[in-house]
Amino acid sequence: MAEVYIAGVGMTKFGKSSQTLTELFCEAATRALASVSVEVEALYIGVMNPEEFTGEGNIASQIADALGMTGVPALRVETASSAGAAALHAAFHAIASGYYRHVLVLGGEKMTHLSTSATTRILAGVIDKEERRCGATMAALAAMITERYRKRYRVSRSHLERILCQVAMKNHLNGSRNPYAQFQGGVTEEAYFSSKLVSTPLRLYDCSPISDGAAAVVLTADRSDVRIAGIGQGTGPVSLRERDSFTSFSATRIAANRAYHMAGISPREIDFAEVHDAFTPFEIISTEDLGFFPAGKGWRAVEEGKTALDGALPINPSGGLKSRGHPVGASGVAQVVEVFWRLRGESEPKLKREVNRAVTQSTGGLGSNNFVTILERSDASRRSQRPAMVPSSSSPRAPRSKKDSVPSEPSEEGRIETFTILYVTPDGFLPPLALALVRDRRGRLLMAQGEDIGHLKIGREVYLRQVAGANYFTVKSHLTKVREGLRRLLRTLPSLALRRKGSESRKKAE
């Protein structure tokens, strides 16, 4: 397998742009090609949904034409919000196999011209249909994961909010030093806590913005000063209700183990990382899934300053998706651009430690198609001979039948596994909207919409019903539980009386 290097990179400023999607791609490509003298043999383009965002199809051919590269093979790659990383990995394989020597990788999206509700609807298209039927959005599902994480690792709600605030403040501070970032200013604690709730416990500053932008990387078989040492991809269930864990993304763990295995290193040899922080808690979970911190300890690393720019392991020194912006198809490529610059000493401010090796982690959908890339300086020496991690295997699940894809009638009662109150709702749903993942009496997990927003708590018992294919729940009140207990007791009284009478009769007979 041939070594794969990075010859050049380029990126537009992220944010709200008057340029078309094609113009953004061309600007990024022109910047990446400006400092290299290679003949591009193929184009790999990562973009999530130009058909709905900008009404454009056949985008790969359009970009090739606009760049004056007609005749050059052009391929569009899509894996939701990890599309840019997917394009990079596809190009890596093409060079590593020896089929091409020089490939231009592009990632981009144009989103800001649409309303927030329209963009939310398009982005929600990557999540499970049944969960969408109840009004779930990406933010709502991220919030439900956050609430479950808080409960599992026994972090109080107020404590968790302070941790998430620290992540947001850190990334906005980092982004304020990045000329390509959408947000050029920091965020204060006061601003964070006064920002509106999007989906409890997530606030506005916990969510990445809607953005326009593009990024480009030229991959080559010719030696340069930065190489791609390892790559990995993993997939996981699309729906939240079918997951083995609500506090970790198995797709990231699989991808990370494969990348570490290919690179022949362990997580301890990574100097910094750019991770997919579309929501602040996802940064914390990603650092655990990448093996930097034990499960349930990532939030402590934030609290102790370990992930800050001057910490032991800086996370998102560019500002991440949270501050740099998140034009969904561009983000996976932009992460590699940022790492390339920092490994070459071209990013400010400099990290306090010498940097030789870094990781990028890109998430597709709700963690259902994730990519990990390890980049290193070509002259980097290994600090130790630690054994590489072995790729984790994932046992295939049985294929879902047509019957499984149709929501079945839930049993009448269940228990809340996790929940959120959504304040920024999709079209057709009024805020505030209570959503919960409920385990019914048959042991099945169901996404359900609440009749009201009061008394929500993990473990609380609820009534379930289904209307037009959508599930609804009502929290059992304390009075209801008392009444049910009395009914059960009253139902047992006749049998108790009969048993007592029978016992007395036997005694008399004796």
Listing of model-derived features with the role each one plays in the protein:
Residues 451-465:
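Short nucleic-acid-contacting surface segments enriched for D/E, G, S/T with interspersed K/R
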Residues 380-418, 422, 468-509:
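OB/S1-fold single-stranded nucleic-acid-binding modules
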Residues 1-22, 27, 129-132, 152, ...:
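Condensing-enzyme catalytic core mediating Claisen C-C bond formation in acyl metabolism
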Residues 1-82, 90, 149-163, 167, ...:
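Conserved active-site "lid/cap" helical segment
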Residues 53-58, 241-244, 277-299, 327, ...:
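Short glycine/threonine-rich loop-to-helix capping motif typified by GTGT followed
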Residues 78-109, 139-178, 217-222, 324-347:
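Active-site-proximal alpha-helical scaffold in enzymes
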Residues 1-5, 50-103, 110-141, 183-209, ...:
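Conserved catalytic cysteine-centered active-site region
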Residues 424-437:
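Short aromatic-glycine-enriched beta-strand elements
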